[in-house]
Amino acid sequence: NVLNTPEQQKEMISLMPSGSMKPMLDIGQMVYMDQKIERYLAHGAELSHIHLHDSHPAVHMALGDGDLPICEYLDILESAGYKGMYALEQNDPRYRSNPRQADIQSIRWLKKHGIFD
């Protein structure tokens, strides 16, 4: 990654005159860099995109295959009023032969945990 902290994102965005660049949160990068989600919430309503995936220790896994506290992260985001987009990011080699199955697994996980119907 070129930008590894929310503060670096803020600095880069301040250099862009168009206002079209927005900050994002990559769950895996946040964990890998030993950061807390609250640092990204400092972006406020500008935070508009989140890469959502499970991980162990530094791979992008389908939800439920790793050991991250995904429910805790989603609760924090909901409590903070996050209204942006999520992208499922699951590119671990185990999914290459059937990537659709990883999507289905993550969607089922989200439904099981009441994230959406």
PLM feature spans:
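Histidine-acidic metal/acid-base catalytic patches
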Residues: L3-D117
